[in-house]
Amino acid sequence: MQIRLEQLAAQLSKGLKGLYTVYGDEALLVQEALDTLREAGRKEGFTERTVHTVQGAHFDWTELLAAAQAMSLFSDRQLIEIRIPSGKPGRDGSDALQRYCDALNPDVLTLVSLPRLDKATQNSAWFQALEIGRAHV
């Protein structure tokens, strides 16, 4: 479901989804959306936050998959941010993101941030997995 930034607060008042994809070419608007989602998550008890930034081909996707399934030591619910500044996770990342979406943990709120994406990327299998039944801003 596509949500515009000005609609985000109203949408969040109806409840959080498990995964949000935030992308665009306006860095300030992307940051505002992420801040709004983080605050909504905190209010719902997602107090432990981990950030994974994908930088090149050396990112450990298995660590991300394990983090999503691990129980938190300090809180019941956790927020995981996945930042993909290049907008291209690569073949391993594509597979990992699809597996991640197939096994979403209800005690994990996931925020995926990306730059503006071209049509080919939006039609890719990994991006479609992020979209199906979820929200993107």
Task: List PLM regions with ranges.
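Non-catalytic interfacial helical region
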Residues: 1-6, 10-13, 17-19, 27-134
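An amphipathic, basic-hydrophobic helix/alpha-beta surface used to engage anionic
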Residues: 22
